[in-house]
UniProtKB/Swiss-Prot annotation:
Pfam families: KOW (PF00467), ribosomal_L24 (PF17136). It comes from Macrococcus caseolyticus (strain JCSC5402) (Macrococcoides caseolyticum). The keyword Membrane does not apply. This is Large ribosomal subunit protein uL24. The keyword Kinase does not apply. Part of the 50S ribosomal subunit. The gene is rplX. One of two assembly initiator proteins, it binds directly to the 5'-end of the 23S rRNA, where it nucleates assembly of the 50S subunit. Keywords: Ribonucleoprotein, Ribosomal protein, RNA-binding, rRNA-binding. CDD domains: KOW_RPL26. GO terms for biological process: translation. Coiled coil: none annotated.
Amino acid sequence: MHIKKGDKVIVITGKDKGKTGTVIEALPKRDRVVVEGVNIVKKHQKPTQMNPEGGITEFEAAIHVSNVMLLDPKTNKPTRVGTKIEDGKKVRVAKKSGEIIK
């Protein structure tokens, strides 16, 4: 999976198409990511001892990694991710600009 926690991404398909945000959590086993402010869902919760109020809570649900693209750090446009070896270490590279990603 080429997307990591902390990456800036844009949603390319689905109901939130065009929205951008930062990856809060990456779930590589499920091929999903949680993006800040994207795919907001409501959950109805019964009152419990921990949460005596109960009610409806909103939170970000996971979105499939194929539905997001990394934003190029140089041009701020969607780009694919490649890898190259620099100083004996593998680094991620933006395909459009060749810029190294963190």
